[in-house]
Amino acid sequence: MTTKKLTKLLALYLPYLLLGLVTTNLGEAWRLAEGKELGDKIMSMMGTVPLAFANPLPSLHPLDILVGVCCGAGLRLAVYLRGKNAKKYRHGMEYGSARWGTAKDIEPFMAPKFADNIILTKTERLMMSNRPPDPKNARNKNVLVVGGSGSGKTRFWLKPNLLQCHSSYVVTDPKSTILLECGNVMLKNGYKVKILNTINFKKSMHYNPFAYVHSEKDILKLVTTLMTNTKGEGSGGDPFWEKSERLLLTALIAYLHHEAPVEEQNFATLLEMLNTMQVLEDDEEYQNPVDLLFEELAKKKPNSFAGRQYKLYKLAAGKTAKSILISCGARLAPFDIQELRDLTMYDELQLDTLGDKKTALFLIMSDTDSTFNFLISMVYTQLFNLLCDKADDVYGGKLPIHVRCLIDECANIGQIPNLEKLVATIRSREISACLVLQARSQLKAIYKDNADTIVGNMDSQIFLGGSEPTTLKDLSEMLGKETIDSFNTSDTRGNSPSYGTSFQKLGHELLSRDELAVLDGGKCILQLRGVRPFLSDKYDLTQHPNYELTSDYDPKNTFDIEKYLNRKEKINPNDEFVVIDADSLPSA
C-alpha cells in the first residue's frame, strides 16, 4: 500500500479510533461502578468517571477495550447507514450542470510562451508539447473547425496558426490566397516553401507519386488512393470491374517500379503502356507489346509480384479485357493532358523530409472545379504514410519537427483512405490534422460511418458560425443544459380576484439551435476534450506578432510564385556534396 493511500485511510478512520480509545475509560468507569441495578450503576458512575479519566491513557482491560471497539464500530455503522439513505441533492444543477469555461479552466493547457501554442480563440490556446507538466492535461493537436461561408475560417483561425511558425505545415490553399499572403512570412522565418498548384500547372513544382513507392505495400497504397479519388460521383456499379482495374493497375505500376528506369516511373509511361494494350476479341492468342513484356518477365522472374498480378488480369476473356482497359483509360484520362504529364514526370516536393526540417507545403486547388483535386488527396495519403514510416524507422517513433496539416475546404479534396485510423495514430509521431469544414454533414457525406470516428479523435473542436441544421442540432446537444430559475405570476380578475407568484427550476440549453444560428460574427465556440466549452472572441489576425510580414499588412509582402520557382539555388560555402561516379554503379 502506498503512503498516499495509507494517509487517506488513516484520515478516514482516525475519528472512530479516537472515540474508541476515549470510551475505554468509560468502560472502566462502568466496570468500577457499584450496584446490581442499572439505576444504581449509573448513579455510581458519577463517582467512578473522574477516577477512570484521572489516567489520560486508555484502559487496556479486555472488557474496557470491548466497550471502546463497540462504540467506535457503532459510530462508523451509524455514519454509513446515514450516508447510504441520505438524499442526493445537486443544488443549482437539478436539470443540468452545463456552464461556460473560464480562464482558470484553460490555464493548465496553455504554454507560457505564446509561440509554443496552437491558437484556438482570442483567449484560449493549446500547448504544442505532447508532454505537459501534468499528464492528465495532454491533448492531441487535431482540430475540427466548422463554419459557414464567410465565417472567417481562413482569416480568424488558419492564417494565425500558420504564422506561429513552430512546425512544418501542409496547407490546403483554395485559390492560392494563403500562399500569396503568408508565403514571405515562411521564407523570412527560415522555411523551405514547396508548392503544388492544381489550378495553374505552370506555377507548380513537380509531383510524382511513383517517387515514393519503395515496396509492394506502397504500390497497393498508391493504387487504392488513385482509385478512391477517381471513381466519380454516384453509386458504384459491379465491383468486378473495379477489382479488375485494380489488378491491372497494380501489375503495371509494379512492373514500372521493379523493371523500368527511374526516369520512366511516372504516369506518362503508365498511360503509354495502357495505350499499347490492344485486345482482339476474336483472337485470344494475340499478344500486344505489354503481353510480351510480361512474358519476358515471367521467364526472368517467375514469381514476381507484377507478373502474378498480370496473370490474374489475363484470366479475363477478350471482350472483358477490352472493357477493363476502357475503364482504366477513363480513370486515368486527366493524365492525358500534357501539362499534367509534365507535372508528374519527376518529383520536387520531397514529402518524406517534412519532419526533418521546417517546411511549408502549399497545396493549391480550385474551390469551383474538383477535376484535379484527387492529386491533393494523393499527396495527403502518401504524406501520412511516409512520415509515419520515417518516424518509426528512423527517429524511434517521433519526428524531430512536428508536422501540422491545415486542411482547408477538407470536403473538396476527395477522400483520404483510412483517415479515421490515421487521426487516431499520428499523434505519437508528432503529426496532426486540422480539418476545416463548412458543415459537419460534409464529413458524413464523404466518410459515411467513419465520420464519427474522425470527429471523436479531434480533441479540439471550434464552431465559427453557420446555419446548417445538423451542425446546430449536434452542437446544441453537446453543449448540454444548465439549470435556470423560473419566476411565474398569476393574476385572476373577476368577482374573486387573486394574485400569486411561484418560483421553480427548469433546464435550458446552454445555447439553443436558434441562438447558435444568430451567433455574433465576432464570437466562436471552442470545445476542448475534458473541459467546459468556451464562448470566446475569434482571434484578431492583426494582433499576431508576424502580421506585419504578411501582404494583408503591406502589399509589398505579396509572395511572387513565378519568381520563387524560377530562382536559382545558391551554393553556400558550408554545403556538403556527395560525388557519385555513374560508371561505378552496379548495372540493373
Language-model features and meaning:
Residues 98-100, 125, 141-142, 308, ...:
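General secondary-structure edge motif
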Residues 423-525:
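Conserved ATP-driven motor cores of ASCE-family P-loop NTPases powering translocation/secretion/packaging/pilus
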Residues 49-55, 63-118, 216-226, 272-276, ...:
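Short alpha-helical interface patches
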Residues 13-16, 30, 100, 157, ...:
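A residue-identity detector for tryptophan
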Residues 21-28, 134-431, 446, 514-538, ...:
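P-loop NTPase motor domains
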Residues 113-120, 374-382, 475:
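Conserved long hydrophobic alpha-helices within structured protein cores
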Residues 1-151, 155-158, 202, 481, ...:
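Basic- and hydrophobic-enriched, low-structure N-terminal and domain-boundary segments
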Residues 126-132, 231-240, 262, 485-504:
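Low-complexity, polar-biased intrinsically disordered regions enriched in Pro/Ser/Thr/Gly
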